[in-house]
Regions:
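Ordered, small/hydrophobic-rich secondary-structure cores
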Residues: 1-28
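Short, structural beta-strand-to-alpha-helix junction motif
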Residues: 2-4, 32, 102-103
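Short alpha-helical interface patches
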Residues: 7-11, 36-44, 104-112
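Acidic, low-complexity, intrinsically disordered interaction modules
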Residues: 22-93, 115-177
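Intrinsic disorder/low-complexity detector
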Residues: 91-102
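Short acidic DE-rich linear segments
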Residues: 181-182
Length: 182
């Protein structure tokens, strides 16, 4: 069984911005998971999970005006990093280990190829950092997914350190794993 949105949403941190994208390019941005209308995407399948910079209203109480342009030049919006979840009507042909719980081996093929992952063990909160998805070793494969979020990356490349705005390039994806299921 493939991963559906109704399953993955249980693991996404409540305090991160989200960009829900569809394979056709249409997307909707949310400040928090709680802002997504209940069951809106539950029937859709996860195609991928990553990080992206997306536009948000400077006034969190209003919806940004549609610019109608490919290049957004509105003074009413700002770009902010978000967890990106790409959804599809049809599941990807990825075999899961089991349908009862989400193991890291089942999540890994859906993760963005790179950059900057922190894999955290919930039991002792130790972490290891990996630049690319392919660098994450198999030793985590049988661990249960406990959470997915984003945090500031302390070892940002020099170019991005000097940028005075918030961007996904200053973040890393955090994947919390546990020996026990959630």
């Amino acid at each position: 069984m493939a991963i559906q949105f109704k399953e993955i949403k249980k693991y996404i941190a409540r305090n991160v911005r989200l960009s829900i994208n569809h394979k056709d390019g249409y997307y909707e941005n949310y400040l928090f998971m709680a802002d997504i209308p209940e069951q809106k995407y539950d029937h859709l399948y996860v195609y991928g999970i990553g990080m992206i910079d997306v536009e948000f209203s400077n006034d969190v109480y209003t919806v940004p005006a549609k610019s109608g342009e490919a290049v957004i030049t509105s003074k009413d919006i700002t770009l902010k990093p978000a967890i990106e979840i790409v959804l599809s009507e049809k599941p990807r042909p990825i075999q899961r280990s089991n349908d009862k719980e989400l193991l890291f081996r089942d999540l890994k093929p859906y993760l963005q190829n790179g950059r900057n992952f922190a894999v955290v063990k919930r039991e002792d909160w130790s972490s290891e950092i990996y630049e690319l998805r392919r660098d994450i070793p198999e030793k985590y494969d049988n661990m249960h997914v406990y959470g997915i979020g984003m945090e500031d990356h302390p070892w940002v490349e020099e170019y991005w350190r000097d940028v005075d705005y918030e961007t996904m390039h200053k973040k890393r994806m955090v994947i919390v794993l546990s020996e026990q299921s959630k």
